[in-house]
Amino acid sequence: MEKKIFTTMAAALMSAAALAQTPAFPGAEGHGRYVTGGRGGKVVHVTNLNDSGTGSFREAVKTGRRIIVFDVAGVIALKSELKIGDNITILGQTAPSPGITLRYYTVQPGNNNIIRFLRIRRGEEKDINDGADATWQRNKTGIIFDHCSFSWSIDEVASFYDNNNFTMQWCTVAESLTNPGHSKGAHGYGGIWGGKLASFHHNFVGHLTNRGPRFNGARYGWTGYTSNKDYDTYQWKNTVQAENVDFRNCVMYNAQGTCYGGPGGGQINIVNNYYKAGPSHSLKSTTLNGLKVSVSSGKERGNQDRITQVTVSTSGNSDKNHPEFYGMTSRYFINGNTTETTKGSVTKNKDWKGVIYDDGTYTYNGEEYSADKKNFYGDAVAHQTISGVSCVKIKMDAAAPTGEVTTHSAAEAFSKVLAYSGASLYRDEIDARYMEEAKTGTTSVRDKGKGLEIW
């Protein structure tokens, strides 16, 4: 049964003005649902597939307030990184078949962006650098992605954290390149996700070796939420209380055991997601064109029943300018999640039985606790002194603010995400392959360009 999830806490804090706002489009949900984009602005037509110049996509998205529509379809071969201006709406669904695909360089959204039915498949053919995500952004306000497809990155496929009022819904985040030239060697990462009211729902996350996803937490000490004027519907006392992430109804396939994070504090909901392990979780090595290729396994991959790993903030994983967050983890509300192993064993409501903890948490009466030496979580959260340290329970009894999201069971989400996620108006063969592999429990082994992909 479908139901609207809107927490008591969220309802109490939401102002009357916010409730009266108009959604970005029919079906816009989560914390970015009221983004206005280019509403009321000029309609601009993209009339060619050129990288730049009159009629190009790059020219259209330079400045707002604009609504971008497409008279053409096909691949736009970017010649440099693309930064989208503020107050822009991109309606990829207006393109004729087969839709619009952006290639070769990273795409960054701006403030107050609505981006729908767009494919961003970066690749390593034209440019290799350690920060080469397919798409990413931080320190912005008001972004909603709907039915977009992201793949083929050198760093992460899609990283969004330390943004205000963000939604990524019905998107595919898949197939980062395993070893395309990153200075750290083999990478293949999904994304770093977080935000000051951020929603990630009904997304397909697949074929990754790590960060599927990694929750960012408050470890960087970002305080940009204090200047949020457009969507200032909540008031927070500090960046830990402001960090609120809702992760629900997503499908993780062949990325099992790679969800982790939350260092530095925050509130994270993990609700009704479906975690399905793929063949690479049991594969130790394979041979391709006569080459023996190792595949990540063991602790690096995580076990097939893992929901998430709770990460403690340290000098090694957090901002060295903010040691006040060291020793802290996020707090979690975890409910309704399903795991499926490569042997077909399905476990409903795995939830807290699938959570593991970094060293540095505290145990008291059978419960795990995070340090909170400076009372960032506030007096409203019960504290317990353990070994002389003031701590808070990691498990939350009630969900953090969710925005308004139509929520399905994990099993229903699996079917719906495979049917409708990504730029599915004209689903390309790449997304179609991901969905078929998730259904059948299979993978592809391909030698693509310089990066050897093992899935």
What are these regions, as identified by a protein language model?
Residues 10-19:
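Hydrophobic h-region of N-terminal signal peptides that target proteins for export
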Residues 29-30, 42, 61-62, 98, ...:
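Long, contiguous C-terminal flanking segments immediately downstream of a protein's structured core
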Residues 51-52, 74-76, 96-97, 121-122, ...:
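Solvent-exposed loop/turn segments at secondary-structure junctions
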Residues 58-64, 75-91, 98-117, 122-141, ...:
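Extracellular beta-strand-rich solenoid/capping regions of secreted or surface-exposed proteins
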Residues 23-68:
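Acidic Gly/Asp/Thr-rich repetitive segments characteristic of extracellular carbohydrate-active
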Residues 87-92, 111-122, 139-152, 164-182, ...:
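Right-handed parallel beta-helix
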Residues 102-106, 127-137, 152-160, 181-195, ...:
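Extracellular beta-strand/beta-solenoid scaffold signature
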